[in-house]
From Swiss-Prot:
Gene: rpmD
UniProt record, GO biological process: translation
Complexes and interactors: Part of the 50S ribosomal subunit.
Descriptive protein name: Large ribosomal subunit protein uL30
Protein's organism: Caulobacter vibrioides (strain NA1000 / CB15N) (Caulobacter crescentus)
HAMAP family tied to this protein: Ribosomal_uL30_B (MF_01371_B)
Keyword Ribonucleoprotein in record: yes
Family to which this protein belongs: Belongs to the universal ribosomal protein uL30 family.
Disulphide-bridged cysteine pairs: none
InterPro entries registered for this protein in UniProt: Ribo_uL30_ferredoxin-like_sf, Ribosomal_uL30_bac-type, Ribosomal_uL30_ferredoxin-like
Amino acid sequence: MAEAKTVTVRQTGSPIRREKDQRATLVGLGLNRVGRVSTLQDNPSTRGMIRKVQHLLEIVE
């Protein structure tokens, strides 16, 4: 069985003074502190969440 594609993201920005939905999106991605790294399945819903808070994230290669 083929291994599922994944994407790894690191939080680079603080959720302080951000809209409530952006903070909730970070929590949904498993991020709640600057510098935290999370590996997620690469699917359209995850990509949409990443795009919503892309200014607070960095894609880790």
